[in-house]
Regions:
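Bacterial Sec-dependent N-terminal signal peptides
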Residues: 1-22
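N-terminal pre-catalytic segment of deacetylase/amide-hydrolase enzymes
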Residues: 18-38
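Acidic (Asp/Glu)-rich catalytic clusters
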Residues: 27-29, 54-60, 77-89, 106-119, ...
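Structural preference for beta-strand elements that scaffold enzyme active sites
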Residues: 36-38, 63-67, 87-93, 158-162, ...
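A short alpha/beta connector and helix-capping loop motif
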Residues: 48-72
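Substrate-binding cleft of extracellular glycoside hydrolase catalytic domains
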Residues: 87-145
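Catalytic domains of cell-wall/extracellular-matrix polysaccharide-remodeling enzymes
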Residues: 137-228, 233, 252-253, 264
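C-terminal domain-boundary segment and adjacent tail
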Residues: 189, 286-331
């Protein structure tokens, strides 16, 4: 997601949206001054471990939204779960990269249709930079459309769209196609266009760029879509402090404290917090070395202390489904 604020605006929007005290949360009917949060899990469908973590975090924890990587091998199991657990807020984690060394996936469109999206093995590129170097905007649109169509063909209607590794925010042309596909299917796209306090601090964005980003948010709002006020996207880089035991109890305690601190830093308005809840098996280390932080996300979401904090502070949890319903009622 490091590309988010670097390229978000260059989509041909030239107007500047002056910042006001009214958040998108308020425009959607939430009380003024309240923190309204989506606790969102990325990477569903990537592996058995990812699916198990998602299922536990959504049914036993406080996480309340998820997005699915449609090119990945464990998608059928996740879609079955979503059909059985009706009402879960589930979107698409639009995927244009395959970042792991020995665990790869390929474009749904097929190499002949999107040759710029594949490496010499026929898999998607491992990095965002490689996608930018080799793929055209037409290929990107073709592939993300195929991912939406696969979901719909499986009887899975996504509540929202977002971007794996932020690839769709890497260039203005990619961003245009992301928004275009969302509008064509009337599916909300994840885009923070409000005060952006947290994401600006993370990315080091200046005031001029933030004003431009707010212009994109205004455009999406005018098109009938909900818009985020902010985005928290720093949990993936977390690790246990040096010297701490690496057992489940310690991981849970430390990462719960991390999320409580993160929620304290959230400003009033509508914020999405990104996480990667995973229940790592003995196989997961052969996929990725990120098991500790991913397991920590799961354990934190299931910690009664986190639920208690959210309730005590009066933080409102919402979903993309609710946001679109609220937006549809506003003229």
């Amino acid at each position: 997601m490091k590309y988010f604020l670097l390229m978000l605006l260059a989509i041909g929007v030239t107007f500047v949206h002056a910042q006001t005290d009214t958040t998108y949360a308020e425009r959607l009917g939430f009380p003024r001054g309240k923190k309204v949060v989506i606790l969102h899990i990325d990477d569903a469908g990537m592996s058995y471990d990812s699916n198990k973590g998602v299922m536990d975090a959504l049914t036993k924890g406080v996480a309340n939204s998820v997005s699915v990587m449609m090119p990945c091998p464990w998608v059928p199991g996740m879609v079955t779960f979503l059909k059985e657990q009706k009402g879960i807020d589930a979107g698409l984690h639009l995927t244009l990269t395959s970042e792991w060394k020995d665990y790869r996936w390929v474009p749904l469109s097929g190499k002949p249709q999107v040759p710029g999206l594949v490496d010499s093995t026929g898999s998607m590129w491992t990095s965002v930079e490689q996608v930018v170097q080799h793929a055209s905007a037409d290929e990107v649109e073709r592939e993300i459309t195929a991912q939406v169509e696969r979901a719909l063909g499986m009887g899975f209607k996504p509540t929202h769209l977002d971007s794996h590794m932020g690839t769709l925010f890497a260039t203005s042309e990619f961003l245009q196609r992301y928004i275009k596909v969302g509008m064509q299917y009337r599916i909300p796209v994840m885009l923070p266009g409000g005060h952006n306090t947290l994401i600006a601090a993370q990315m080091g964005a200046d005031d001029a760029r933030l004003q431009q980003v707010r212009g994109v948010g205004k455009m999406l709002w005018a098109a009938g879509f909900p818009v985020l006020d902010d985005l928290h996207n720093e949990s993936y880089g977390w690790d246990l402090p040096a010297g701490k035991k690496r057992d489940a109890a310690t991981i849970q305690k430390e990462k719960t404290a991390y999320y409580i601190a993160a929620l304290q830093s959230v400003k009033p308005g509508l914020t999405m917090m990104i996480m990667h809840c995973t229940a790592p098996t003995e196989v997961f280390p052969f996929i990725s070395d990120s098991g500790t932080t991913r397991h920590g996300d799961l354990l934190a979401m299931m910690d009664p202390a986190l639920r208690s904090y959210i309730q005590k502070e009066g933080i409102i949890l919402t979903t993309w489904r609710e946001l679109m319903e609220r937006r549809g009622k506003i003229k």
